[in-house]
Every structure is written in C-alpha cells, then in structure tokens.
C-alpha cells in the first residue's frame, strides 16, 4: 500500500509538471456580435486568457471610447452587465484583459503626462480603482493588452511603467501584441522596459516573418529574435481561420506537426494567441492538446 501511494503521488506530481510546462491559448473577443458571449467563450475551456477588444479612442485629451461591435453599446451604459461574464471567466482561472488600440482607431499619447493620465483612467475605470463610470461595471479586469498599430511610437513605455506601479495595490498584468518584424515599430520602447508578462507576436499579415509557402524558416528566425526579449512568456500569434487575416494562416495539422515542434522548446514559450473568437470554429480545439 505504501509503494502504491508513493507511485500515485509521483504520478500526480509528474502530471502537474506537464501541465505547468504546457502552453496556453489566448483569444481576442469583442469585435463581432455573432461570436457568442464572453461567458460562453470562457465556458469552452479552450482559453487561458481572453482579451476584450478594443479601447479604440484614448489619449491626447480625447474622451476614451470602447468599441465592442455588436455586443453592447458602452456609450449607452449597456455593457455593465459584462461584469458577470468577466467574473464567471475569472472564477474558472481565466484572465480577462482590456486590449488597447487595434488596427483602426484614434489613439495617441502626446506626452509622458498624457500617458500617466491614460494609466490613471484605465486603473479607475477597468482595473482596481474606483469610478462612477466604469464601462464594464464593477468587475476588475486582470490587466491591459497593448495592441498598438498606429498613432505614435512614443510614451508607451511610460504607460507601461505607470500601470505596473499599480501592481503594488493589485497585480496588473501587462501584455502586448507586436507585429512579427523585429523590433516592432510601435512598441519597441514599451517592450524594452521588461515589464510585460506576456507578449503574443502577430505572425500574420507580415510575409517576411510568417509561415509561407510550406516553410517555417522565416517564422523560426523571427521567433528566436522575439524569444530573446525581456518578457515573461512569448506566444505565437495566428489567425484562427483563413478569412481572419490577409496572410499567415497555418492549418491546424501543419501547426501541430511542423511549426510548434520548432518553437515549443524555447525557454519563454507560452503558447498560441488566436485572432479571433468569431473565426475560431474548431481551430483551438484541434490544437489544444498539442499547444
């Protein structure tokens, strides 16, 4: 009996170790009203992190604007009910982030002071602070995702530093979604702070560094460069379907058999990020066991 108990304990510890070393799947949610609710997204049990997309207007004295496509209208106060969904996700151990920027929007940091003002706004309206005008209600998000693809290359480092300081009160996870050309045009300064917990690099819509023509050589080369930055974990960002991006889609069987084996031994390998929930019609389920 003692020997059996020892073997059982050893097996449990081994399986826990495997789970700790396994990668996670990250998904973007919020840009299509037909993609299902946030709660349903988390209930699939496929994702470890969900990025709510996007805060499309902020900085430079502008009134911040959250765009959740057909899900709800934040300007009319119709998104506060998402607090229940956010808590449902978090109760399952899933982190829920607010994503800033995106490919379309009006965002710009005009100065370091402007960046600090934006950080204070985010803390009070989405994170652990207090405000009477919280667009998503009283739920506290886990952190902020930087999906910056325009505006300015400056002051994102100050935004990251100020947000990070709030972690003294409650942990604020910082994540980023740079393009795969290295270094990233917009976020290089912010990433150089070394403050980011997770970085999911967009290996799509960028032919020089994505999977192309049956070859993962370019992807692997740029992956190695990204893996060398000072960050917690690096994720492979991909479209979840052919129609989710202009280029860079990798069929699930090819990803599992040819691409992931090239990168999942990297010290900072974190898993796979997918754009987006609307396009994820079985892709995450097909790769989950191998991520």
UniProtKB/Swiss-Prot annotation:
Record keywords, A-Z: Carbohydrate metabolism, Cell wall, Chitin degradation, Disulfide bond, Glycosidase, Hydrolase, Polysaccharide degradation, Secreted, Signal
Expression induction: By TMV infection.
GO cellular component: extracellular region
Protein name per the record: Acidic endochitinase
The EC number(s) this enzyme carries: 3.2.1.14
GO biological process, one term: polysaccharide catabolic process
Catalysed reaction equations from the record: Random endo-hydrolysis of N-acetyl-beta-D-glucosaminide (1->4)-beta-linkages in chitin and chitodextrins
Protein family (similarity comment): Belongs to the glycosyl hydrolase 18 family. Chitinase class II subfamily.
Pfam families the UniProt entry points to: Glyco_hydro_18
Protein location: Secreted, Cell wall
Natural source organism: Nicotiana tabacum (Common tobacco)
Organism superkingdom: Eukaryota
Function per UniProt: This protein functions as a defense against chitin containing fungal pathogens.
Chain ranges of the GH18 domain: 23-291
Lineage: Eukaryota, Viridiplantae, Streptophyta, Embryophyta, Tracheophyta
Active site: 149
Cysteine disulfide links: 42-89, 72-79, 180-209
Chain segments annotated as coiled-coil in the UniProt record: none
InterPro entries the UniProt entry points to: Cts1-like, Glyco_hydro18_cat, Glyco_hydro_18_chit_AS, Glycoside_hydrolase_SF, Glycosyl_Hydrlase18_Chitinase
GO molecular function terms noted in the UniProt entry: endochitinase activity
Leader peptide range in chain numbering: 1-22
């Amino acid at each position: 009996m003692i020997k059996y108990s020892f073997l059982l304990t050893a097996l449990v510890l081994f399986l826990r170790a495997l789970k700790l070393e396994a990668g996670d799947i990250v998904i973007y949610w919020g840009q299509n009203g037909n993609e299902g609710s946030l709660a349903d997204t988390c209930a699939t049990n496929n994702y470890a992190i969900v990025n709510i997309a996007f805060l499309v207007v902020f900085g430079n004295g502008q009134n911040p604007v959250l765009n959740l496509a057909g899900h709800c209208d934040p300007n009319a106060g119709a998104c506060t009910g998402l607090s229940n969904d956010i808590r449902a996700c978090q109760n399952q151990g899933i982190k829920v982030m607010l994503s800033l920027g995106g490919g379309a929007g009006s965002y710009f940091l005009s100065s370091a002071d402007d960046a600090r003002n934006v950080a204070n706004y985010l803390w009070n309206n989405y994170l652990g602070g207090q405000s009477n005008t919280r667009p998503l209600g009283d739920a506290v998000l886990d952190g902020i995702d930087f999906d910056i693809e325009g505006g300015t290359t400056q002051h994102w480092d100050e935004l990251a530093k100020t947000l990070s300081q709030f972690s003294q009160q409650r942990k604020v996870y910082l994540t980023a979604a740079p393009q795969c050309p290295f270094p990233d045009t917009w976020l290089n300064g912010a990433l150089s702070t070394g403050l980011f917990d997770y970085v999911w690099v967009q290996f799509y819509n960028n032919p020089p560094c994505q999977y192309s023509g049956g070859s993962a050589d370019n992807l692997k080369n740029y992956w190695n460069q990204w893996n060398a930055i000072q960050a917690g974990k690096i994720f492979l960002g991909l479209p979840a379907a052919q129609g989710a991006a202009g280029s860079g889609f990798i069929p699930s069987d090819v990803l599992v058999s040819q691409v992931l084996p090239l990168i999942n031994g990297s010290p900072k390998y974190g898993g796979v990020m997918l754009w987006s929930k609307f396009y994820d019609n079985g892709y995450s389920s097909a790769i989950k066991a191998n991520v």
